[in-house]
Amino acid sequence: DLFMHNFKKVLKTFLVLVVCVALLAALDLALYPCTFMRNDVHAVVTQQFDDIIVGTSHGKMDIDPEVMQEVTGRSGHNLCVGGEYGIDAYYLTKLIKEKQNPKRIIYEVDPGYFVSEKEEGNNYLLFYHEFPFSKAKVEYFWNSIAKCNFRTVLFPWYEYSLSYELPKVKDTFTQKVTGDYDVSHLKSDSQEYHESGFIERYPVDVTKLKKSEPKLYEEGKVNEENMEYLKKLITFCKENDIEFVAVTTPIPINTLKDYSDSYNAAWKYFGQFFEEQGVEYLNFNTQYFKAFTHDLKAYTDYDGHMNGDAAKEYSEVLAQVLESAGQRK
């Protein structure tokens, strides 16, 4: 009788857990939004690409893999996004290597990201949430999400406002259940997402732009963990016979002048770092300064996010520079 009593207790607990898990999964399905990272991760794990571009919002808006392919003949996908740190790029690369066979990683380097800490929560989930089950996902969980607030793990949708989520529940649910990755869902008044992962920003009236201070590099303030993951990524690429190239995209001349001390210190630091690592670093604000315009007209803000037309031109230039750098080796 005691056995039955205990068995029922265990069974009850188990059933409550099952119901909780099912409920959390259902809420996640209905409330966690379909982000462009969902499309990006799906693309890179289900298709083979030669070039994978990782990095920040500058890379996302400035680098169009389809334009690059016309020059290099190499297929590519843009996996950059604002808020992507070294740790994310590292585990994204590990995930892709687990599922496919990338030939080259192009890392877009925004110096400001190396002196700041990655924010908890949403910022990790943006990537982690979209990983299919894999060794990379388990490692990524252990080294990032596990250190976050438990709400992040159990209620990934809690950081998105319900007023934003509720009207979209039906669409979110349908898109996930039917495996719908149509890019038209990701279009807005100011930009559109392309299947290649590139986000095309529509041109803006630059005379109306307001200056705001970008994330700046500060000497002696480098976050060790960020550099650690960048080194890990470079080592991982070397061990797996994946070429690694670092790129810093052009910044408008007004901004370069306003913060010249900070930028000069950053270029020196990263120039030296990549040289020590023995990898190619293409900086479009120093040795390739003249390769592309720094006139504000080509951008949508002082920070250096290009409009779509400029990004297409820049991607062609970047592809040519990559080709000639490859031939020099």
Locate each region found by the language model.
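Short, Lys/Arg-enriched N-terminal segments with co-localized hydrophobic residues
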Residues: 1-3
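Hydrophobic membrane-insertion alpha-helices, especially the h-region
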Residues: 12-30
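Alpha-helical transmembrane signal-anchor/signal-peptide segments
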Residues: 32-50
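Short hydrophobic beta-strand that contains or immediately precedes a catalytic carboxylate
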Residues: 52-55, 306
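Membrane-embedded segments
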Residues: 54, 58-145
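Secreted/periplasmic serine-hydrolase-like ester/acetyl group-modifying domain
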Residues: 124-236
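Active-site segments of SGNH/GDSL-like serine hydrolases
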Residues: 234-259
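Long, positively charged, glycine-interspersed low-complexity recognition regions
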Residues: 260-329
